[in-house]
Amino acid sequence: MSVIHTTEYGNGYSLDQLIGDSGDIYYRACKDSVCRYAEDHYIAMMYLEGMGWDPKQQDPQ
């Protein structure tokens, strides 16, 4: 798996877009070193919110 794009949201929150060896796209939502993987961007954003990220208070950097 390789990272295509990373978005840092501050306070340890980040979202990586990954591509697998077979060409499939995945997402990795992280808070510090705790990460969850998803095949869908919407689900990955829900994971970030579940980890405590508030999209109304933080802008991507």
Regions picked out by a protein language model, each given a short descriptive name:
Residues 26-57:
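A short, charged, amphipathic alpha-helix used as a generic interaction element across diverse proteins
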Residues 1-28, 35, 60:
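Short N-terminal "domain-start" leader segments
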